[in-house]
Curated annotation (Swiss-Prot):
Compartment(s) of residence: Cytoplasm
Catalytic activity: uridine(1498) in 16S rRNA + S-adenosyl-L-methionine = N(3)-methyluridine(1498) in 16S rRNA + S-adenosyl-L-homocysteine + H(+)
Protein name in the entry: Ribosomal RNA small subunit methyltransferase E
SUPFAM superfamilies per record: alpha/beta knot, PUA domain-like
SMART domains attached to this UniProt entry: DAGKc
Organism: Synechocystis sp. (strain ATCC 27184 / PCC 6803 / Kazusa)
GO cellular component, one term: cytoplasm
Length: 303
C-alpha cells in the first residue's frame, strides 16, 4: 500500500512516499521497503476522531504522560482496542487503572490524549487530539551497514531518539550478519519503544535489508541528498558540507561496516551520485558513526 503523510511545521511541510509491507504474523508494525521521494502524511482517520477537540501540548498537562504507539486499525471512531501485551504494559508495568490517562500515537503523526476505560475488554477512549511537532523538518533516512552481534540495536535506539525518519539495513562486502525475520521484528519493537520514550509522532520503519548495490540504485534522484560517510579520503566534513549546500527535500546517509567500505563500494556510490563526507580525523566504530552523523544533521536542521 502506498502511504502518504505530512511532516514538518506549519510553515514547512514535506511529503514522503513509502511502500509498506507487513511482517508475517504481524499487522501492527509497518515496514518500509525504502524511503525515496520526500513527503509525508494523510492518515485514514474517521471523522469522529478528526473532530475531537485539539489541544496544544503544554508542559504542565503532558510532560509526564505515558505514551503508547498503536496500529491505526486499533482505532475505531474514538475507541482504541488494546492488544493483550499493551493492556499488560499499561496495567502491570505502568500500574494504570480505569480512568487513568495516557497518550496514544498511531505512528503516522496522530497524537491523542486517552483514558483507560474498560479493563475487561481492553479499551481506551480518545479524549482530544494533541497538537505537537517534535520531528525533524525534513526526512533523514539512515542506511547502515549491519555490524556484527547486537550492534544494530545499539544504533537504532539513539538514532530514533535523534529523529531518524527510516532505517535501511545494508548487506555489504564486509557484512558478517545475515538477519532473520525475528531480528527485523525485534528491531522494530526497539524503535517503537524509543519513539514512545522520545515523544516522536512518527514511527521510523526498519526496512528489509538490501545489498549495497540494490541500495545505491534506489537512492538516485534530484530531490535527495545522498551522503556516504568515509574515512581516510580527502572528503569535506559532514557539517561543513551541509552548511554549504542547499537543503534538499530529503537526506539519505550511509555508514559503513567494520573495516569500512571497499574501494569498489565507494566507487559505485560516487558513480550513482553519492557525496563522500567525513565525520572527523578519528576512526569511529561502526556502531558509533550513525549516531554521530545524525547528531550533526540534527543540530544543523534544528538550529
Amino acid at each position: 500500500m502506498l502511504a502518504k503523510a505530512f511532516a514538518g511545521s506549519k510553515s514547512h511541510k514535506i511529503l514522503i512516499n513509502a511502500w509498506f509491507t507487513t511482517l508475517p504474523g504481524q499487522c501492527q508494525k509497518p515496514i518500509v521497503q525504502f524511503v525515496l521521494s520526500p513527503i509525508l502524511v494523510s492518515t485514514n482517520l474517521t471523522p469522529s476522531i478528526l473532530s475531537l477537540p485539539v489541544q496544544e501540548k503544554s508542559s504542565s498537562s503532558f510532560v509526564m504522560a505515558y505514551r503508547l504507539v498503536v496500529a491505526p486499525e486499533q482505532i475505531i471512531e474514538a475507541t482504541v482496542t488494546l492488544t493483550t501485551a499493551q493492556l499488560h504494559y499499561l496495567q502491570r508495568v505502568l500500574r494504570l487503572q480505569k480512568g487513568d490517562g495516557f497518550m496514544v500515537l498511531d505512528g503516522g503523526g496522530g497524537v491523542w490524549r486517552a483514558q483507560l476505560n474498560d479493563l475487561a475488554h481492553g479499551t481506551a477512549q480518545l479524549l482530544e487530539t494533541v497538537s505537537e511537532q517534535n520531528e525533524l523538518p525534513l526526512p533523514v533516512t539512515l542506511a547502515i551497514a549491519l555490524p556484527k552481534g547486537s550492534g544494530f540495536e545499539e544504533i537504532i535506539r539513539p538514532c530514533t531518539e535523534l529523529g531518524a525518519t527510516a532505517f535501511q539495513p545494508l548487506l555489504t562486502e564486509r557484512t558478517l550478519l545475515k538477519p532473520s525475520q525475528n531480528k527485523l521484528e525485534r528491531w522494530q519493537r526497539i524503535v517503537t519503544e524509543a519513539a514512545e520514550q522520545s515523544e516522536r509522532q512518527w514511527l521510523p520503519p526498519v526496512a528489509a535489508p538490501l545489498t549495497f548495490g540494490q541500495f545505491v540504485e534506489k537512492v538516485a534522484g534530484p530531490e535527495t541528498l545522498a551522503l556516504l560517510c568515509v574515512t581516510r579520503l580527502n572528503s569535506p566534513m559532514l557539517g561543513a558540507y551541509l552548511k554549504q549546500s542547499n537543503l534538499p527535500a530529503q537526506i539519505v546517509l550511509a555508514t559503513g561496516p567494520e573495516g569500512g567500505w571497499t574501494d569498489n563500494e565507494i566507487s559505485l556510490a560516487i558513480a550513482k551520485g553519492f557525496q563522500p563526507v567525513s565525520l572527523g580525523k578519528r576512526i569511529l566504530r561502526a556502531v558509533t558513526a550513525p549516531t554521530v552523523a545524525l547528531a550533526q544533521i540534527n543540530a544543523l536542521l534544528e538550529s
